[in-house]
Amino acid sequence: MAESVEKLEDGIVRSAEQVSAQIRAAKDAIGSVIFGQDRVIENTLVTILSGGHALLIGVPGLAKTKLVETLGVTLGLDAKRIQFTPDLMPSDILGAEVLDESTAGRRAFRFIAGPVFAQLLMADEINRASPRTQSALLQAMQEQHITVAGARHDLPKPFHVLATQNPLEQEGTYPLPEAQLDRFLMEIDVDYPDRDAERRILFETTGAEETLAKGSMSADALITAQRLVRRLPVGDSVVEAILSLVRSARPGEESGEAGKFIAWGPGPRASQSLMLAVRARALIDGRLAPSIDDVLDLAEPILKHRMALTFQARAEGRTIPDVIKQLKTRIG
């Protein structure tokens, strides 16, 4: 029995070393095209390795679309993009059945797949579409299949959605409800690049030749990596840190002083997301097990879209990141 366990552990170690090298190569390849967004790249890779979806928040012109295109090439995924608008219908995303007539004169319905049938889908400005259209995509994200005219159609594997939102323009938008926000593993802030990164952007993107992304992985290799993430061991101290942090982010006794600022907090799905994400981050760094530092670093992007502040907190000028930072001091 002990020998079989040892063989299993050796197999995980060898697989982890191989997968970690592939992921680091992919990360470097993406970084050679997307400048000054290292944290965004890492968190996006963590989301994908965890098998989840991400919501990218940033003003226009910060390479969000370029990031998705580059991820598709680097990870060997079929990538597509949907520009969400108020008149976009669910059938524009999912697909529809059309009536075809054969050469013999026979008529039959044929399903034409929509752009949701991709391995990596960019939902650009998702909050501009109607709630009905948003729900169609978010249901597909959760269930990994769609149903049209009573027929089930499975989505390709892997299937990941990277949705974007512009934090400045709120007129004519439909904010995502809390239940739908919870389906995104992370909310990732895309900030302006620093001065050195912007200087590099000027030189490398305005010349005669443009740097193109190179493939580093395949879809099958990514699926293997995602399965490996779920097999990585997690220490009891890390599990307790996850439980303490997520439970303290809810109103109640466990939140302590911060409880008076929290109107509602994350459910068990946040704990699941954090458990997967810390494993994925450890694998990217070449480690076989996550640490409490991983929990603290990933707490904000995983928790902040799953929380709301009380009127008192907003009146005092507090923000959700402020509250999460306060909660983290009780863990680390």
Where do the model's predicted regions map?
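C-terminal engagement/docking regions of AAA+ P-loop ATPases
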Residues: 1-13, 17, 253-332
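Conserved C-terminal "switch" segment of AAA+ ATPases
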Residues: 12-20, 33, 173, 187-258, ...
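Pre-Walker A (pre-P-loop) alpha-helix and adjacent loop at the N terminus of AAA/AAA+ ATPase modules
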Residues: 15-59
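Conserved alpha-helical scaffold flanking the Walker A/P-loop in AAA+ ATPase domains
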Residues: 43-46, 100-122
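Walker A/P-loop
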Residues: 48-86
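P-loop (Walker A) phosphate-binding loop of NTP-binding proteins
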Residues: 59, 93, 164
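Canonical AAA+ ATPase core
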Residues: 100-104, 129, 133, 141-232, ...
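Walker B catalytic acidic pair
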Residues: 124-125, 136
